[in-house]
Amino acid sequence: MSVIAPPAPAEAAPAAGPARRPGTARIRFALTVIAVYVAAAVVGPVLLAYDPVATRTADRLLPPGSRTSDGGLAVFGTDQVGQDLLAQMLQGARVSIAVGVATLLLAGLIGVVVGVVAGYFGGFLDGLLMRLADVQLAFPSILLAIFIAALLGPSVVNVVIVLAVSNWVTFARVVRSQVLTVRGREFVDATRTLGAGTWHVVRRCVLPACVAPVLVVATVELGHVILAEAALSFLGLGTPASTPSWGVTIANGRNYLAEAWWIATIPGLALALLVVAFGVLGDALRDRFDPRLKSL
């Protein structure tokens, strides 16, 4: 008589730890790069002895690693008027990050309010707000920013206003889409049935569902805003020329690419790396929070 052996118990698949979660490596890389930039922007101008706007004609166009007339080290060299390039970049990073964060707070506030109102109440108000958003999307955001900046003039506050006006639509459309998905669910209907008011439903049921998509959009848009601020400053429509900015530094070095390539190249590379880091972080957070992408 043949004996049939019982089947061996199936081994349980190892649980996915933090390292297996989607985008973990990319998130760590991007956060490391961003943390270095933030630390340099906060601490660098305090520790560096050089004034970013002090001119030293005797030290003009020194290449990276040169010694200045007072014996100091110009790590990234100097520009056409002898200003230390590293000091300008550190101060410019502070300006760019501050402008980016302030712009996102203002644009995010406008976009979230518009998106919640349009998505939750719907009807005529929804159609009006979304048609306004469509009209703004018909114009390239950078051209709209240039037009408004030309009217307001160069100023840090004006740059924040210009970029916020140019970027609120993305937040509004994402939040509206999320609100339309959430407002018809059973737990929202149950909350209304129990007598909860509109503000209570929005605050306890709708807004928490919008946190993840808004975080993803904000991360990606922060890189776009920093790049747009540099573009406006490059054109003379952003921060004043007396305020160190990556865009101003790149603009000052564009006429010296043959003899002093470092003036425009080094800030340009630093700007590109920061924008890429925010883009990578945004993509990784999207993969982490979007359930439709977790199986890919």
Residue ranges and their predicted role:
Residues 1-4, 294-296:
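Short, intrinsically disordered, low-complexity terminal/loop segments
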Residues 2-54, 132, 210-211:
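N-terminal signal-anchor/first transmembrane alpha helix
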Residues 21-22, 68, 225, 257:
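Generic structural signal for beta-strand residues in well-ordered domains
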Residues 28, 32, 36-81, 237-240:
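Hydrophobic alpha-helical transmembrane segments of membrane transport/permease proteins
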Residues 81-296:
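Alpha-helical transmembrane segments of integral membrane proteins
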